[in-house]
């Protein structure tokens, strides 16, 4: 199988979508998981104020609200968690996102003290973290907090990973990539925008430049700069459209380079890495 055929088969992106149908598909998927696992009563999600967590949060709250209405069980709850490292540059966007999704519960856990303590402990042991490695510490601390909250509320951690992110592996292993359920997978970036538009989301939340904003020395570094390819090019590629050869090569290189992130820990029986 050619590399592009394999990528398209793995990422499951449709050439065209009906935004309303895809919204219902994600909501019903989330509800079905709760109905199957009746001991689960909550969804937990970290909210950044960007497109992906805004969309995921809205879908999660819709699913929880419908579960309460259908079952009469008020124990079903959605926890939207703000996880700043110190002060977040686009805090106003996060507040706008929270107001849009109207979560049952809003929590704020500032991760700065925990991350700084970890960095200091490593330095004391002779391990000096680079700015990039410290950025991954932030992502993993955020996920640790979300799992702690989920543990106390019969919950699962919802992920924001979509196919345009999955194909490039643009997430931290066991950080924002370490979730329980991903309702956006199968959608690319522009399709996510279409869902938010259908849901009546404020435009500025899905038109802003995507950024992981993990590095102290490169605040708000755009994803597209870090990747060396635009989301429009990634979206076109995943929809089977023509893209410049250099963009296709970069996407395919990211896919191969980050394949380990899309698997559990490698065992002697795995051969994808060979």
Swiss-Prot record:
Mg(2+) binds at residues 52, 165. InterPro entries: NAD/GMP_synthase, NAD_synthase, NH(3)-dep_NAD(+)_synth, Rossmann-like_a/b/a_fold. Pathway: Cofactor biosynthesis; NAD(+) biosynthesis; NAD(+) from deamido-NAD(+) (ammonia route): step 1/1. It is an enzyme of class 6 (ligase). The keyword Metal-binding applies. One of its GO terms (biological process) is NAD biosynthetic process. GO terms for cellular component: cytoplasm. Its EC number is 6.3.1.5. Deamido-NAD(+) binds at residues 140, 173, 180, 260-261. One of its GO terms (molecular function) is NAD+ synthase activity. ATP binds at residues 46-53, 160, 189, 211. It catalyses: deamido-NAD(+) + NH4(+) + ATP = AMP + diphosphate + NAD(+) + H(+). Keywords: ATP-binding, Ligase, Magnesium, Metal-binding, NAD, Nucleotide-binding. Homodimer. Catalyzes the ATP-dependent amidation of deamido-NAD to form NAD. Uses ammonia as a nitrogen source. Belongs to the NAD synthetase family. This is NH(3)-dependent NAD(+) synthetase. The gene is nadE.
């Amino acid at each position: 199988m050619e590399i592009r055929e394999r990528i398209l088969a793995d990422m499951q992106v449709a050439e065209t979508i009906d935004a309303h149908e895809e919204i219902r598909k994600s909501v019903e998927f989330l509800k079905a998981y709760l109905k199957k696992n009746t001991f689960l009563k909550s969804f937990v999600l970290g909210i950044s104020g960007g497109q992906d967590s805004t969309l995921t949060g809205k879908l999660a709250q819709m699913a929880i609200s419908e579960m309460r209405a259908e079952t009469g069980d008020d124990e079903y709850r959605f926890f939207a968690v703000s996880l700043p490292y110190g002060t977040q540059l686009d805090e106003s966007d996060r507040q706008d996102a929270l107001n849009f999704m109207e979560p049952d519960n809003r929590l704020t856990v500032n991760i700065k003290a925990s991350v700084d303590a970890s960095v200091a402990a490593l330095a004391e042991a002779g391990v000096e973290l680079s700015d990039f490695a410290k950025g991954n510490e932030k992502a993993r601390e955020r996920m640790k907090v979300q799992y702690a909250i989920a543990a106390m509320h019969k919950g699962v951690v919802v992920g924001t990973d979509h196919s345009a992110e999955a194909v490039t592996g643009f997430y931290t292993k066991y950080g924002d990539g370490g979730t329980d359920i991903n309702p956006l997978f199968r959608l690319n970036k522009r399709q996510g925008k279409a869902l938010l538009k259908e849901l009546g989301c404020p435009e500025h939340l899905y038109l802003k430049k995507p950024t992981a904003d993990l590095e102290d020395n490169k605040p708000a570094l755009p994803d597209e700069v870090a990747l060396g390819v635009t989301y429009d090019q990634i979206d076109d590629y995943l929809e089977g459209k023509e893209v410049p050869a250099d963009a296709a090569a970069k996407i395919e290189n990211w896919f191969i380079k980050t394949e380990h992130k899309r698997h559990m820990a490698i065992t002697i029986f795995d051969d994808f890495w060979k």
